[in-house]
Regions:
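Histone-fold recognition with a strong bias for associated Lys/Arg-rich disordered tails
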Residues: 1-174
Length: 174
């Protein structure tokens, strides 16, 4: 497979993930930080996460619950964890499979949902969201506009059928 180039959106997202890691006092950029950045992304990946009820404040609290708050005052050398590097690499594999022109945040979200062992995937599962639902919705968003319009009603029904809205769940105090 030909190596795909990271889109400007994905490069910016990785930088944003680094900012989140620094804000949380973490000395690494993990898949959880990539998921946080994806939740704020303006494209399809961010919309899919927000439609599932995963807003940035909710995800931030889940990351803090799992990894804790580090020191924000110390200079912390940062880099992608091996899992995060693998996720970016797998995003390239997804882009190649789909024969797209570059690696986008949507491809990264596809890759994260395929890796059951990564922290981002565990956060999704812990919040009551099936990674497969996120994968299906994201994959649908990557289809051509004609295909998307034809399948829009089906995909919305699938999301409603298999995914919980975390905002509604929180409002019910479950």
């Amino acid at each position: 497979m030909k190596k795909q180039e990271l889109s400007g959106r994905l490069r910016g997202l990785i930088v944003q993930a680094g900012r989140f890691a620094r804000e949380l006092g973490h000395s690494y950029v993990g898949t959880e930080h990539l998921l946080l950045a994806l939740s704020q992304e303006a494209g399809s990946a961010g919309r899919v996460l927000r439609a599932a009820g995963l807003e940035e404040p909710c995800l931030r609290s889940m990351v803090l619950a799992g990894a804790g708050l580090g020191s924000r005052t110390l200079f912390l050398p940062q880099g992608l964890t091996p899992r995060a590097r693998r996720a970016v690499h797998q995003a390239g594999v997804e882009a190649s499979r789909l024969k797209t022109g570059g690696v986008t945040p949507e491809h990264l979200l596809l890759a994260l949902t395929r890796d059951d062992g990564c922290t981002a995937c565990r956060i999704l599962k812990g919040s009551g969201i099936e990674p497969d639902c996120i994968f299906t919705e994201t994959f649908g968003a990557l289809r051509t506009p004609e295909q998307t319009q034809q399948g829009r009603q089906t995909s919305v029904r699938l999301l409603e059928q298999y995914c919980e809205n975390m905002i509604e769940k929180a409002a019910r105090m479950e």
